[in-house]
Amino acid sequence: EEIVTKYGKPGEKQHMRCPVHLSIGQEAAAVGACTHLTRNDRIFSTHRCHAHYLAKGGDVRRMVLELHGKLGGCLDGRGGSMHLMDDSVGAVASVPIVSSSIPLAVGSALADKLDANQNVSFAFFGDASMEEGVFHESANFAAVQQLVGGHFI
């Protein structure tokens, strides 16, 4: 997160074209969650996705370019801070809407089950997500379908 914070100091000209939601102090959780995931495993994140993206193998240079809205960013500057994605490393989606990463991860886990592979789909979300119906619906569906996946709050 030091890369990001050096561009957002109060009173200085802002270099980023988009809101940046940091997760300072939470990087170790992302690393721990992603350590044993493979490139074929997929993560679905929130608006605080920087650590998840990097822990899954995302490129630092492409992340910084994305934060600045530049070509060469992980989405060629179109996604910004809250939408870091790189399918080649399994960082499939970063969704800023509360709880929205959860059903995507469950759908991905269902696709893996139907394809009979051993991939894992992993959703990161905040505690407020558990107040949303989609959290409970997704958890119920995943249990009934016996899907392989993980959730990290």
Q: Which ranges hold each PLM region?
A:
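A short, conserved beta-to-alpha structural element at the edge of catalytic cores
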Residues: 145-153
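Cofactor-binding active-site loop characterized by glycine-rich and histidine/acidic residues
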Residues: 2-5, 9-145
